[in-house]
Amino acid sequence: MNINQLISKVKSKIEKNISLEYINIEDKTFLHKSHKTHLDGKFHLKLIIKSSEQKKINKIELTKKIYKILDEELKKYIHSIQILIN
């Protein structure tokens, strides 16, 4: 899976499972290419969302929900993910 496919899949899965006002996903893999632990095919993503759900549940619970939604992608394709909830 390439980065564009991964971003598309992540965005789609989150949009289907969380009520969003805004979502932006950035590829930050280039910041980690020189690290010893960098693996080809594993990506670093920055996820920025604004959700009406955060009014119902706190940021920690929303973050847990995102991790559950992206479980497969985290195991196979995502080395690290930064989640910003506005």
PLM segments and residue spans:
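N-terminal, polar/charged subdomain of small-to-medium soluble alpha/beta proteins
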Residues: 1-86
